[in-house]
Amino acid sequence: MKPAWALLRLASPQLPIGGYSYSQGLEWAIDSGLIQDADAAERWLADQLTLNLARFEAPLLLAHCRAAHEGNWPHLQELAERHRASRETRELALESRQMGYSLRQLLEGLPELDEAARELLASHHEPGLALAWALAARAWQITPDDALAAWLWGWLENQLAVLMKVLPLGQQAAQRLTSRLLPTLEAAQQQAASLSPEHWGSAAFGLALASMAHERQYSRLFRS
C-alpha cells in the first residue's frame, strides 16, 4: 500500500474518533468576545501552535509515536501516564480519553495491528489519544514524523471547523487562514522534533482558563 494512503487515512476527518465535537476552549473565546474576526482567530491559533503545541503537546506525541514505532512498550507506558497527568481541565481530560477510546475501538477490529501492540492496547480501557494515535501509526506503518504531521493537520482542521460554525467564518476565508498558518504549523513540527524531553513544557494559562470557563458556558455546541 502506498504510504500516502495510510497518512491520508490517519489525517482524515472521517476517522471515527469524534474530533469535530471539541473546540479546546475556542468556542468560549468566541462567545466571550476575545475572537471576533479572522485576524483575532489567526492570533489565537498561532499562539496555540507556538506556545503550547510546539513546546509540549507535539513533542510528547512524537515521543509516543517513536516509542510505538520501535516497540519500546515500557517507555510508551511512561509517556502515556505523563500525557494523562498533563491534562489541565476536566474537559480536556475527557476529550483525550473519549477520542483515545474511539480510536481503540477502531484499532481492535482491524487486522493491521500486531499482537504486541494489541496486548498493550487491551490493557488500556480508556487510552489517551496520544497512545492510541501512536499505535495507529504503527499499525499503518506511518513514520513518527508523518504521524505528528497528520495530528497537527487534524488539529488545525478541527479548529477551523469551529470557526466556520461559531464565528462564523466562510470556507474561502478559512482556506486563506490555512495558508497564513501553514508556516507556523511547519515551524511547530520542526521545533517539536528538535526538543529533548528536559525542554518539554508550556504554560498555556489562557487555554486552561478558556477550557474551565467553557465547562460552565450556558449555551454551547462543543464538548470542550
Swiss-Prot record:
It comes from the Bacteria. One of its GO terms (molecular function) is nickel cation binding. The lineage of its organism: Bacteria, Pseudomonadati, Pseudomonadota, Gammaproteobacteria, Pseudomonadales. Required for maturation of urease via the functional incorporation of the urease nickel metallocenter. One of its GO terms (cellular component) is cytoplasm. Belongs to the UreF family. This is Urease accessory protein UreF. It is found in: Cytoplasm. Keywords: Chaperone, Cytoplasm, Nickel insertion. Coiled coil: none annotated. The keyword Chaperone applies. UreD, UreF and UreG form a complex that acts as a GTP-hydrolysis-dependent molecular chaperone, activating the urease apoprotein by helping to assemble the nickel containing metallocenter of UreC. The UreE protein probably delivers the nickel. Pfam families: UreF.
